[in-house]
């Protein structure tokens, strides 16, 4: 648990990014993300840690809002949750290279996925959504998909066949 609460943690994260990336926009984005996004995990401490893992491991590419970078990095906000409507989509979320190859433990990755899904994708989740577990992540996260765009496009077609149109096959 970080002393000083979430705001102190946000400033520490911002300072870390400033030291290592020397980027004022990254510091501002990290601080805003760490403070502004609501907590919905299994407790404030767990949610705070999951959010910190997001900031340090995911946000640099997927951006502070989870909106991604058009043409380069897919959005996570308001789209990732749709993939969990399909068993293959649920596996996809764990096997994209950034998740599969991350240095996060299986539990930490499960926590980050659950945090992203429950904070940025609430309306996209199936009604019977079950949070990821460390055991599930350990069983399915590797190997990473080598052609993630093709897998994604196939999943989007399967979602569209079920009447779910919330995510584009291109990003």
Where are these regions (language model features)?
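N-terminal secretory signal peptides that target proteins for export/translocation
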Residues: 1-21
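Internal catalytic or translocation cores that form aromatic/hydrophobic pockets or channels
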Residues: 103-111, 115
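Detector for the c-type heme attachment site
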Residues: 62-67, 117-118
């Amino acid at each position: 648990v970080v002393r000083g609460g979430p705001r102190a943690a946000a400033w520490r994260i911002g300072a870390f990014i400033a030291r290592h990336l020397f980027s004022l926009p990254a510091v501002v984005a990290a601080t805003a993300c760490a403070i502004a996004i609501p907590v919905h995990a299994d407790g404030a401490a767990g949610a705070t840690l999951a959010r910190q893992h997001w900031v340090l491991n995911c946000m640099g590419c997927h951006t502070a809002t989870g909106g991604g970078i058009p043409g380069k990095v897919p959005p996570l906000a308001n789209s990732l949750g749709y993939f969990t409507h399909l068993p293959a989509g649920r596996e996809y979320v764990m096997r994209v290279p950034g998740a599969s190859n991350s240095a996060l433990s299986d539990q930490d990755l499960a926590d980050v996925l659950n945090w992203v899904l429950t904070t940025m994708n609430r309306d996209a989740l199936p009604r019977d959504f079950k949070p990821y577990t460390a055991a599930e992540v350990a069983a399915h996260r590797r190997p990473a998909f080598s052609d993630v765009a093709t897998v994604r496009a196939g999943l989007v077609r399967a979602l569209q066949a079920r009447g779910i149109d919330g995510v584009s096959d291109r990003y």
